[in-house]
Curated annotation (Swiss-Prot):
Modified residues (Phosphoserine): 308
GO cellular component, one term: nucleus
Record's protein name: H/ACA ribonucleoprotein complex non-core subunit NAF1
UniProt-annotated location(s): Cytoplasm; Nucleus
A Pfam family reported for this protein in Swiss-Prot or TrEMBL: Gar1
Residue numbers carrying N-acetylmethionine: 1
Length: 489
């Protein structure tokens, strides 16, 4: 008996050691979830390995649970070792037997407590996450998404404080304040009804005129039935036969202080020229206007306005058309006259050049003076040679000769015979041959060029040839025969 008891104690110690070893943490791949409390696990398959028992959990005091009682058979022998095809669980051996498939009740309780604690932990974590998400969602606010209708309503609400206006338009609150009228008409001045108040819009009073009365113009003073002035006409709109008049006030309270209400009859004083100004329709027909809007919805400039009367407009267009045609005709005439002037100028130059070429070939003197015009042929020797000197410029001009230009220093002094001079008693050698022709830019001057109206023209534009002048009269016997050109050398 002692041997049996010793063997039982040894087996108990072995089982306790294996239980403590199994309490060690297992790898994650070998852990299996415990069944819920109150549910028995299914029995293992005959050919498969049995499921490993769950690790025992310690109680709150940190002590391990008591080991289960060993299962002995009826003969008092220990249980046989496990089958070869079954693997022992990691961490130690486990007891097999008839009741080995059922886990110990203590271990089931510990497993259920572990699962409960895990579920509670999961629930706590989920509740904490939900609470944190709810708190974070309450802290962060997103702008609401508006539909098209909501956006239009919001824009309309914002634009109420900013009315639409053109570039240079003045709003009512931007206009100067209305002056207060304290005019009371006496009883002897007649009043005539103008119309009734049809509507009151903020600080404006609209008066609809009655028929069969002449329309009145702006700044006409309007009176109430008690003969007190209500205000001046601010604007007129509508047809000429049935216009609407607008009275402007500083505010709606100003209108109430005047005692003006809808359907009140308003009057005007037709006999008071200082308070009443009429609109003359005939004058409007003469004025030009336009209903079309211009830049920034303003009135168009005067040059693009139209007449109110069709006949006046037709006359104005015809007058404008005739002016344009007159300007075109004058321009064409000026162009034609310019072309004619150019043609005459070209013919003039061509004729002058031909005459110059003839003078070079058939005349003896390069200056172009004819011998037979101013000199008489002597029956003796030829006239002596006389050279032109710059000191006798004035004497040449007095006789009608054009002096040589002094701005050309290259020009030589050409010989020419003195007019009206008889040289019978002065025998001189014959004259030298004629010099070469002058440059093309030099013109030919006629004897009467000093008195010709085209004297101021440049030398490149010579005048046309003129008829020869009459011969000069013969000198008197008592006249001094001294030369006008100085002594001979």
């Amino acid at each position: 008996m002692e041997v049996v008891e010793a063997a039982a104690q040894l087996q108990t110690l072995k089982f306790g050691g294996s239980g403590q070893g199994s309490a060690a943490p297992q790898p994650p791949e070998d852990r299996r979830e415990a069944p819920p409390p109150g549910v028995q696990p299914p029995p293992p398959a005959p050919s498969g390995r049995p499921p490993p028992p769950p690790a025992p959990s310690s109680d709150p005091g940190g002590r391990p649970p008591p080991p289960p009682a060993p299962n002995w058979d009826a003969g008092g022998r220990p249980p046989p070792p496990p089958a070869p095809n079954s693997d022992p669980p990691p961490g130690g051996a486990w007891v097999t037997g008839r009741n080995a498939a059922e886990p110990p009740p203590v271990l089931q309780a510990s497993d259920s407590s572990d699962s409960d604690s895990d579920s509670e932990t999961d629930s706590d974590s989920s509740s904490s996450s939900s609470s944190s998400s709810s708190s974070s969602s309450s802290c962060v606010s997103f702008p609401p998404v508006l539909s098209d209708g909501d956006e239009d309503f919001q824009l309309e609400k914002e634009n109420k404080n900013f009315p639409l206006k053109t570039k240079d338009e003045l709003l009512l609150n931007e206009l100067p304040s209305v002056e207060e009228l304290t005019v009371i008409l006496p009883e002897d001045i007649a009043l005539k009804p103008l119309g009734k108040v049809s509507s009151i819009i903020e600080q404006l009073v609209i008066i609809e005129s009655v028929t069969n009365i002449p329309p009145v113009n702006e700044d006409t003073v309007i009176f109430k039935s008690d003969r007190q002035a209500a205000g001046k006409i601010f604007e007129i709109f509508g047809p000429v036969a049935h216009p609407f008049y607008v009275l402007r006030f500083n505010s709606s309270d100003h209108i109430e202080s005047k005692g003006i209400k809808i359907n009140d009859t308003m009057y005007f004083a037709p006999s008071m020229k200082d308070f009443t100004q009429y609109i003359f329709t005939e004058k409007l027909k003469q004025d030009r206007g336009s209903d079309a809007s211009w830049k920034n919805d303003q009135e168009p400039p005067p040059e693009v306005l139209d007449f109110s009367d069709d006949e006046k407009e037709k006359e104005a267009k015809q007058r404008k058309k005739s002016q344009i045609q007159g300007r075109k005709k004058l321009k064409s005439e000026l162009n034609e006259s310019g072309e004619d002037f150019g043609e005459v100028h070209e013919n003039w130059n061509a004729y002058s050049s031909s005459e110059h070429s003839k003078g070079y070939h058939h005349r003896e003197f390069s200056r172009g003076f004819a011998r037979g015009r101013y000199s008489r042929r002597s029956h003796g020797r030829p006239p002596p040679q006389q050279y032109y000197n710059s000191d006798h410029m004035a004497s040449q001009e007095s006789l009608g000769f054009t002096p040589q230009r002094q701005d050309n220093p290259v020009m030589p002094h050409y010989p020419f015979p003195p007019p009206m001079f008889d040289m019978h008693n002065f025998p001189l050698p014959p004259p030298p041959p004629p010099p070469p022709p002058p440059p093309p830019s030099m013109g030919w001057a006629a004897p009467s060029m000093a008195s010709h109206p085209v004297l101021n023209l440049p030398y490149s534009m010579p005048p046309p040839p003129l008829p020869p002048p009459p011969p000069p009269p013969p000198p008197s016997p008592g006249e001094n025969n001294s030369s006008h050109f100085g002594p001979y050398f």
